[in-house]
């Protein structure tokens, strides 16, 4: 089969973690001669532009996000709202459907990549475009919660069902705690935009795709991808690790200067992504746990629920006690550059797939502190299956962590003489070496491009 340059449209979920993940894949596709039309709102585009390494091949196409009642006037992505308002962002994204159809009709791409827009496959089929579901969540998560073995539209998922993996699942050691299963079961009844149930939206998006793609490699998630392929009776491909190219900007001076004042590998960096808003009590336990380590730390976290700023949420006397060694910041940060800074030795992560991809190719040790959704099963895979990090202990019933449990996990991974730390460091180093193998990455992307050609040609 003779290959030709493809025209690919991208319309990811309006969360920066998803947007950046899609754009990193675009960079890999652009190197191989493919043309990309990346559909995104203006505020997201401004943040994405430094990550566009091939502007001659990757074009941003602006989409206006309609206002939905309950959202701030200028809300365009999940970074602009608290977690409870994310369904309204989804509703706003659904309301762009007609505009997307108009854009795709004019652009005439060969394929469209999507994730949360369950209506995309039907729209694409009507226009003669192939639909690729590009999943930034791990196949571990999708296999556990959304395959036909687990999921039936219109039926409830009970808490007891979710405590154990579904029949045929590749790893019986990956399980949910009581409080996690309770939340997953309750979410089965939750709508997520436009009065569509969250699980229905995700299941339809998967079930109606022409191709299912995962940002991973088979060396790490192969059995889970095979399981999903059998369950949905669809082709499932890995794009490879998609190692992030460095952004074109330098680290902001306030962070580079601050980090530069500490010894190599000594700083604990904590970040929970653009979507996570902690409850006040968990925010307090987190920052007090960081203080308790006695180590220098940089925490990039949003203000907790009910607070306008992180400064107003600080415990009394905290800022004075950690002055000179503690930096709590409430805005968006250049995480990729921070993780690569030589002073950073530990990363407390919420276990979002994007953050884990960035972390695994750096040398910082991982402390796993998942919050919601796929983060939980990502943490199990990283902590239990791959053993590349230590998960913060939480109460089985209430899911609460304490300052002591935060401090304990950090202390374990930062102690070079601890047996758990030795094992985690060795496993992390092995996977890092695997992921940084440029031949591995290149072969995956080449194979992925070939599969896209086959889908377009109907092979």
UniProtKB/Swiss-Prot annotation:
The keyword Transferase appears for this protein: yes
The keyword Glycoprotein appears for this protein: no
Catalytic function, reaction form: a flavonol 3-O-beta-D-glucoside + UDP-alpha-D-glucose = a flavonol 3-O-beta-D-glucosyl-(1->2)-beta-D-glucoside + UDP + H(+)
Tissues expressed in: Expressed in leaves.
Covalent S-S links between cysteines: none
Top-tier EC class: transferase
Gene3D superfamilies: Glycogen Phosphorylase B (3.40.50.2000)
Pfam families on file: UDPGT
GO MF term (any one): flavonol-3-O-glucoside glucosyltransferase activity
Active-site residues per Swiss-Prot or TrEMBL entry: 18 (proton acceptor), 115 (charge relay)
List of residues binding UDP-alpha-D-glucose: 136, 333, 335, 350, 355, 358, 374-375
UniProt keyword terms in alphabetical order: Glycosyltransferase, Transferase
Residues annotated for an anthocyanidin binding in this entry: 18, 373
Xref: SUPFAM superfamilies: UDP-Glycosyltransferase/glycogen phosphorylase
Enzyme Commission number: 2.4.1.239
Family classification: Belongs to the UDP-glycosyltransferase family.
Additional record remark: Flavonol glycosides (FGs) with glucose at the 2''-position of glucose or galactose at the 3-position of kaempferol are present in cv. Nezumisaya and absent in cv. Harosoy, whereas FGs with glucose at the 6''-position of glucose or galactose at the 3''-position of kaempferol are present in cv. Harosoy and absent in cv. Nezumisaya.
General function of this protein: Flavonol 3-O-glucoside/galactoside (1->2) glucosyltransferase converting kaempferol 3-O-glucoside to kaempferol 3-O-sophoroside. Has a broad in vitro activity for kaempferol/quercetin 3-O-glucoside/galactoside derivatives, but cannot glucosylate kaempferol 3-O-rhamnosyl-(1->4)-[rhamnosyl-(1->6)- glucoside] and 3-O-rhamnosyl-(1->4)-[glucosyl-(1->6)-glucoside]. Has a higher preference for UDP-glucose than UDP-galactose, and no activity with UDP-arabinose and UDP-glucuronic acid. Represents probably a dominant allele of the gene.
Name this protein carries in UniProt: UDP-glycosyltransferase 79B30
